[in-house]
Amino acid sequence: MQKYMLEARQLLALAIPVIIAQVAQTSMGFVDTVMAGGYSATDMAAVAIGTSIWLPAILFGHGLLLALTPVIAQLNGSGRRERIAHQVRQGFWLAGFVSILIMVVLWNAGYIIRSMDNIDPALADKAVGYLRALLWGAPGYLFFQVARNQCEGLAKTKPGMVMGFIGLLVNIPVNYIFIYGHFGMPELGGVGCGVATAAVYWVMFFSMISYVKRARSMRDIRNEQRFSKPDMDVLKRLAQLGLPIALALFFEVTLFAVVALLVSPLGIVDVAGHQIALNFSSLMFVLPMSLAAAVTIRVGYRLGQGSTLDAQTAARTGLGVGVCMAFCTALFTVTLREQIALLYNDNPEVITLASQLMLLAAIYQLSDSIQVIGSGILRGYKDTRSIFFITFTAYWVLGLPTGYILALTDLVVDRMGPAGFWMGFIIGLTSAAILMMLRMRFLQRQPSSVILQRAAR
């Protein structure tokens, strides 16, 4: 029991800074929306439309680079720290290649925006302008993630937290300057949010690089002074590990976007109630997601040390802590659901619907916690391909079709509206949790030599 308590303390020490960093990053999006809304409703809508396209694109790159964390954790645990700098350098090359792809996609996103039904031309122009300003921050964001993953792979999660707050503090005044045109800058409205956020990502990157170069704990693994060409073998391995994570993230984000589109014709009350419940549940999701990042680090480190039993301890402890967190957040959601909904809106019909949907959100928080921590465990074992297949099957083959049938058809029961989609979420997330646990048990029952060989690749 003592070893589990010790592991839980180490996991929480890693996870808490990640939680705070995630809150800071989420707050940046909130600040953009509020400040753009203060300028005009059209500009706020333009930022919302642009963000809905930006997020799937940038999260694809973000997911691809998550492969670095278990690789670095494993090298650190095995005492091969001299190889970490080369992996990080190749991570920068990968980030550069993906940045170009993302920038090309975002530059041409105007075709998607202008094809939307009945979109106002002025709104479309502002949304395109916002994206074309923001896309210049894509390399800065992804380079920052490489440096952050280096730190987190070495069990240093506080730098990411600090840089997240630096980004938030810089974002507010720079937003103000470019939205309203102060200090000789042009008045850009919502487009100014894109300029400011792009600049902030570069500030976060240079701040993180400055820390990495000066940190005593990383003195022995600093990047070599000489230029390093792309190493195709390393890049291929990182891509093989990262691509399934990237696709899983992409399909998860697009799932919620598709549900939002399917709910939109049901009316203002249904849309508002759905959005309130989804926004709050997304906030609660930060807790298990951050714990999953910590579990990836601990499992990778223990496998690097050559101890499959300690890796199992880290995995079980992460699941135990995650389940406890889920029960707490579910109880909080059930008890205060009406008060939470009132923070968003005062329409009685919206409050009633949002409160009902939050009950369903409370039910799936346990499954959500298990599946995301399970995903973190599998990343630690470098078994990322199964993550993609599990999430795709659970969300798109089981969850979304079931939700559609329950919400918008009479095939099984009378049309349930938004609640039907939330029943689909419960089915999808529960399926993902079960499949993740089955895959984890399958991996852990393999011979130690097989597990360690896979981890060392």
Swiss-Prot record:
User: Where does it reside?
Assistant: Cell inner membrane
What S-S linkages are listed for this chain? none
Q: Which Pfam families match?
A: MatE
Query: Keyword set for this entry?
Result: Antiport, Cell inner membrane, Cell membrane, Ion transport, Membrane, Sodium, Sodium transport, Transmembrane, Transmembrane helix, Transport
Question: What InterPro entries does this protein's entry cite?
Answer: MATE_fam (IPR002528), MATE_MdtK (IPR050222), MdtK-like (IPR048279), Multidrug-R_MdtK (IPR022913)
Is Nucleotide-binding set as a keyword in this record?
no
Q: Which GO terms describe its biological process?
A: sodium ion transport; xenobiotic transmembrane transport
Q: Does the keyword Membrane apply?
A: yes
Q: Name one GO cellular component term.
A: plasma membrane
Q: Where are the transmembrane segments?
A: 11-31, 53-73, 93-113, 127-147, 160-180, 189-209, 243-263, 276-296, 314-334, 357-377, 387-407, 418-438
**One example GO MF annotation:** xenobiotic transmembrane transporter activity
What task does this protein carry out? Multidrug efflux pump that functions probably as a Na(+)/drug antiporter.
Name the UniProt record assigns to this protein? Multidrug resistance protein MdtK
Q: Which organism is it from?
A: Enterobacter sp. (strain 638)
What gene codes for this chain?
A: mdtK
